[in-house]
Amino acid sequence: MATANFGKIQIGIYVEIKRSDGRIHQAMVTSLNEDNESVTVEWIENGDTKGKEIDLESIFSLNPDLVPDEDIEPSPEIPPPSSSSKVNKIVKNRRTVASIKNDPPPRDNRVVGSARARPSQLPEQSSSAQQNGSVSDISPVQAAKKEFGPPSRRKSNCVKEVEKLQEKREKRRLQQQELREKRAQDVDATNPNYEIMCMIRDFRGSLDYRPLTTADPIDEHRICVCVRKRPLNKKETQMKDLDVITIPSKDVVMVHEPKQKVDLTRYLENQTFRFDYAFDDSAPNEMVYRFTARPLVETIFERGMATCFAYGQTGSGKTHTMGGDCSGKNQDCSKGIYALAARDVFLMLKKPNYKKLELQVYATFFEIYSGKVFDLLNRKTKLRVLEDGKQQVQVVGLQEREVKCVEDVLKLIDIGNSCRTSGQTSANAHSSRSHAVFQIILRRKGKLHGKFSLIDLAGNERGADTSSADRQTRLEGAEINKSLLALKECIRALGRNKPHTPFRASKLTQVLRDSFIGENSRTCMIATISPGMASCENTLNTLRYANRVKELTVDPTAAGDVRPIMHHPPSQIDDLETQWGVGSSPQRDDLKLLCEQNEEEVSPQLFTFHEAVSQMVEMEEQVVEDHRAVFQESIRWIEDEKALLEMTEEVDYDVDSYATQLEAILEQKIDILTELRDKVKSFRAALQEEEQASKQINPKRPRAL
């Protein structure tokens, strides 16, 4: 039972307490401290147990029902705020409506009061009672208490330190408030989005920030999806663009999307996404690598296949993340994930359990541009991707360079980056137009032991974010959209252990086939986003794509929710085949599978366009290959014809033999050239079909991302 000094306070009950920032919430009493007349309370906040020592006056001022019966109740204070303001919650799609433009934010005007209650109002209450003519039956002792206040109590050192810190905090907050008001006055006249900026600032002020740190544990994921935010660049700062991305914790990303009502009132649509990791604009490449690609290095030493790729809008930081710091077309390769992964590979080779395996390290670097593969380490030679009888994908002619140290890897990366396809867009002066694939390969006695594929994807808005709309631009956009769609479905198949992986739908997934098949395969996706308000739509597209990828791996038991082809009745399958007009080749079957599983993103017209592009690319490769063969054959024809002409110089040459051989050469020429001409005609017809299909695409359909 509690003593008289503690009134009705007992261990185990819940009392209202006031935090140093002004918040009031409940906490449980865990101990009663008679030596300094205080109580110790505990509460749970964000999953952590916190505690605090509070003097009795502060407890009684907020909990008058616990005051001892013989004591005078302290003056009532302002009632605690509603429960909605006690706990800061991150609410998805929460709207913040604009207030009066010149009103300062309510949070910044709040001055935190002292932790100890002041009974200065008691004499005023007494005099007020006397003026009203009321008679008071108060004992002399109680009158003394009322006149001079409660007797002074000794403060503990802990309370004194807290009060000092609180006083400094109050001064600092007042200074910051004055500085914010001064800045607000300066920005108000020039920034057209000042109203939105104030709403974002007020919303951020209500959040509890716990960003990712190097001390946080690294979780094991077969499929890891994370997001990285870059800071505002010089161009965005000059344009007075606003930062609309907030990362309050290690796995949450919030987008403050500005919107406008019918009555022109502006408000924020605060959308929340959750991933495995979220990196803010202060996170360096080393920290991103620590949580993403570094856990995958050991996988390749255990005879596994690992894949790490950067995905996002043009100019959002993909090449910076994978390749290193960029300055125009120059790049510091030593600070990218390519080099950091190579460094750890060579460190792992020195471990005793791996050193005895006598592994050799090789590296390849190639790019995929408009459905074609080019070797970046061999003067950008065009390569062919074929599938052998064992259903193994082979990149014919791809050079593997043996590397002995990190410096060798940096040289190869520098060679590859110097000849990678790039161009100017509205987002970046040097934008990557292709998917760049850098592979670290481990071989043991010539046989493949493990492979780590690091991919810098092209911009996900490439089909729309260029100044022209010619055929080359359409091919770039079609191939990028198709490859990203196929990549998502391959990750779906990997996460759910599906029997079929639609890797043939694009060149990117075709060359990465072995990374999506097998029990010891792991994948990491780094979605890079731009913070500016002008990039809000592309940022949301990137986050939704990454969110769909992660949703597929949250619940492995939800495999039945997927809509495979077998979910359609047989008659509906026939209708779909008629609607899509698909042939029976493996590539088209996989493309059809992608479109049927993503009907909300891919319209029948868009599928027809993708099919026309695929057919055109296949025919282009065949025409070029046949033309090269005809050219080689023409050299032999010239030699044969030269021999025939030399034969006619003789006095008694055989005329019948000459005529027979010449006729044979001409017939062979006619047959081969006629066949080539027919293929060229078909190829030109395919070009026309592609152009017509591009005009039939419904612009209101979502992009196939």
Curated annotation (Swiss-Prot):
InterPro entries noted in UniProt: KIF2A-like_N (IPR054473), Kinesin-like_fam (IPR027640), Kinesin_motor_CS (IPR019821), Kinesin_motor_dom (IPR001752), Kinesin_motor_dom_sf (IPR036961), P-loop_NTPase (IPR027417)
UniProt keywords (A-Z) are: Acetylation, ATP-binding, Cell cycle, Cell division, Coiled coil, Cytoplasm, Cytoskeleton, Developmental protein, Differentiation, Microtubule, Mitosis, Motor protein, Neurogenesis, Nucleotide-binding, Phosphoprotein
Its subunit composition reads: Interacts with AURKA and PLK1. Interacts with PSRC1. Interacts with MCRS1; the interaction enhances recruitment of KIF2A to the minus ends of spindle microtubules which promotes chromosome alignment.
**Positions modified as Phosphothreonine?**
96
Compositional bias of kind Basic and acidic residues? 158-185
Question: GO CC annotations?
Answer: axon cytoplasm; centriolar subdistal appendage; centriole; centrosome; cytoplasm; dendrite; GABA-ergic synapse; kinesin complex
Gene Ontology terms describing biological process: anterograde axonal transport; cell differentiation; cell division; dendritic transport; microtubule cytoskeleton organization; microtubule-based movement; mitotic spindle assembly; mitotic spindle organization
Function per UniProt: Plus end-directed microtubule-dependent motor required for normal brain development. May regulate microtubule dynamics during axonal growth. Required for normal progression through mitosis. Required for normal congress of chromosomes at the metaphase plate. Required for normal spindle dynamics during mitosis. Promotes spindle turnover. Implicated in formation of bipolar mitotic spindles. Has microtubule depolymerization activity.
Q: Which residues carry this modification: N6-acetyllysine?
A: 101
Q: Where in the cell is it found?
A: Cytoplasm; Cytoplasm, Cytoskeleton, Microtubule organizing center, Centrosome; Cytoplasm, Cytoskeleton, Spindle pole; Cytoplasm, Cytoskeleton, Spindle
PANTHER family under this entry?
KINESIN-LIKE PROTEIN, KINESIN-RELATED PROTEIN 6
Name of this protein? Kinesin-like protein KIF2A
Q: Which organism is it from?
A: Rattus norvegicus
What GO molecular function terms would the record report? ATP binding; ATP hydrolysis activity; microtubule binding; microtubule motor activity; protein serine/threonine kinase binding
Q: Where do Polar residues bias regions lie?
A: 122-139
Phosphoserine is found on 75, 99, 134, 139
